[in-house]
């Protein structure tokens, strides 16, 4: 089965909403994303120097990597995902899908 990741950069809508953004992302949004079949895990990262976007890495383990991402778009289109009012939309988050081409270790 193909393996890959979905990589997404996001920022809070404003510095004063950052705590709400992290709470929503960690307590609600990660569960929404990983509810899609084939998206098996999620991790978030912050820049060490405090500058730049936060990133989320979603692990994909499915036959159709792009199809998993399309399921997310379909869910959003049907209104099945929580509001994105805490996300900065300029520029908008863009999911990037990468397929695994090698690995080392466990």
Q: Where do the model's predicted regions map?
A:
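Macromolecular interaction modules
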Residues: 1-106
């Amino acid at each position: 089965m193909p393996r890959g990741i979905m990589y997404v950069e996001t920022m809070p809508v404003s510095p004063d909403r950052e705590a709400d953004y992290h709470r929503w992302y960690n307590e609600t949004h990660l569960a929404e994303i990983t509810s899609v079949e084939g998206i098996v895990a999620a991790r978030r990262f912050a820049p060490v120097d405090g500058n730049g976007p936060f990133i989320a890495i979603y692990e994909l383990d499915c036959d159709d990597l792009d199809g998993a991402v399309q399921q997310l778009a379909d869910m959003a289109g049907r209104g099945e995902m929580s509001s994105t009012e805490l996300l900065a939309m300029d520029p908008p988050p863009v999911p990037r899908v990468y397929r695994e081409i090698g690995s080392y270790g466990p």
